[in-house]
Amino acid sequence: MQETTVKRDGASPSDAGTPATTAQGLGKLYIRTFGCQMNEYDSDKMADVLRADQGLELTDNPEDADVILFNTCSVREKAQEKVFSDLGRVQHLKKQNPNLVIGVGGCVASQEGEAIVKRAPYVDVVFGPQTLHRLPDLIKRRRAQGVSQVDISFPEIEKFDALPPPRVDGATAFVSIMEGCSKYCSFCVVPYTRGEEVSRPFDDVLLEIADLADQGVKEVTLLGQNVNAYRGAMGDSGEIADFAMLLEYVHEIPGIERIRYTTSHPKEMTQRMVDAYARLPKLVSFLHLPVQAGSDRVLAAMKRGYTALEFKSVVRRLRAARPSLTLSSDFIVGFPGETEEDFQKTMKLIEDVGFDTSFSFVYSRRPGTPAADLHDDTPQDVKLRRLQQLQALINQQAAAIAQGMIGTRQRVLVEGPSRRDPNELMGRTENNRIVNFPGVPRLIGHMVDVVVTHAHTNSLRGRVAGIERDTSGAE
């Protein structure tokens, strides 16, 4: 789980631009985002719709805001409790600004609904992931009626038709192609908070990406809870496009030079998807493929729908199609009933497959899920020890991959100034590694060849190919 203040690609919230004058006047919007890239995308859309309708511009200071929104994540219990903690910290701002609107969106909102208002009666608006486009009306009704507004319905794909055109800042962009999940893993709340899988129409996705390309976007990341389960309607023909077909068409859009996607499910990795890595050079050599565990017994209890051997078979076919492919994954340690033998099978899978990074956590019980009723007698200290061992192994594998990149020439999309040194540049390799290097601002938004000179824990350092070798080793 991660948390951010909403921002555009390559820009901080304070870089959002000069507020525009509208019929509603000037105003400031503060959004705090918890969780996944889907939530980051949704936060961007909240900003878009409130800018278009009410002239609100982003601020990174909640004390300056006229509207404060928390876009929440319910995957883990700690994330859920942190939302209420943060809500308490902004409650006093209502005394300073009686017209301040405080809203809660995202998966906690979808799960808790009116209970949020009962627990925190100063919250004005509660909305789900599928009703963020209704934010302007919810805020207007709250101000007109003086009553908290709650809308956590699942109106299919309606929100995409109601959202304003995407605003581009930088050479990268997220594009949501589907919503929800129909897998119903025993530990997961997503099907209950975001609804079942619903895919956007094929043509709508392509038109949005083409529009982004016209505005200078070179890299798109296709988003979905199970993005490779995409099944989009093709016009009025009644035909359905699968995810592999969508990738093939996106690959042909002029101006798009890189394609990423997240999050995928091993069960949906069809042979046509595997073949795409051999046929589509714009598809990056990096894949996030959650496995969760390496024990067949635990995988069955999780209702993941595959065995460890089947997962490894998918990886083997992918790497046969694209030998340079690097993988990241998700792991849950301490799932109810996990034995030491089960855990060692997970460690063996990690050793056999090799990962570049992972999102790994101790199991967090989520009320309302089937796993919440399972008996869990594993001590917390044992779970934490297992998590540390797992993370240490993956960190070791990641370090080896980074060391192996030293001296190689990497194609890098330059995203902006380096966070460590604003006089330098930062970009990403195909395999999703951050590279810091000396360069001039005109390179931002362009692809450049960078020779990797040093490997650090969370980043690489390099020099633009053809420029005198950098020997500083600074991060």
Swiss-Prot record:
Its cofactor is [4Fe-4S] cluster. GO terms for molecular function: 4 iron, 4 sulfur cluster binding; metal ion binding; N6-isopentenyladenosine methylthiotransferase activity. Residues 1-22 are annotated as: Disordered. Residues 1-10 have a biased composition (Basic and acidic residues). It is found in: Cytoplasm. SMART domains: Elp3 (SM00729). It catalyses: N(6)-dimethylallyladenosine(37) in tRNA + (sulfur carrier)-SH + AH2 + 2 S-adenosyl-L-methionine = 2-methylsulfanyl-N(6)-dimethylallyladenosine(37) in tRNA + (sulfur carrier)-H + 5'-deoxyadenosine + L-methionine + A + S-adenosyl-L-homocysteine + 2 H(+). Catalyzes the methylthiolation of N6-(dimethylallyl)adenosine (i(6)A), leading to the formation of 2-methylthio-N6-(dimethylallyl)adenosine (ms(2)i(6)A) at position 37 in tRNAs that read codons beginning with uridine. This is tRNA-2-methylthio-N(6)-dimethylallyladenosine synthase.
